[in-house]
Amino acid sequence: TIFALSTNIKSSGSAIAVIRVSGDKTLNVIDEITNGKADGIREKPRQACLNDYVDPKTNELIDKGMTLWFPRPKSYTGEDLCEFHIHGSMAVINKMLSVLGNINDCRLAREGEFTRRALMNGKLHLIQAEGIRDLINARTENQRRRAL
């Protein structure tokens, strides 16, 4: 199971940051980071649920945020996937990433790994994956249009 910050954050932070998790242990990760209190997440896939995020080792509150769960195969990667929408301060982001990295069988994703998994699971074709890369890297209106 992998995780990564999906939002491009400036050094000063931002209002909101999104952290994605994908893989077989995604529901376990949700349970750990919410202390088993992600009420309704299984019954309401693709719907935002407000949760407290805690460090499972200390029970310390990290943040309150929105959790979205996308069960396989109907997710970007084709695997169970969730998004944690948190406040975008560097302190909150770094704490969440640190805590996720300490959860068993959960590791930081390599660059492009979510899209690679989508490609390998038949959710995207190579040309679509290249288009996503080009769109992410687009700096001009012309580059944006060509990527689409």
Sequence positions of predicted segments:
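A glycine-rich (often HGG/GG-containing) alpha/beta subdomain
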Residues: 1-146
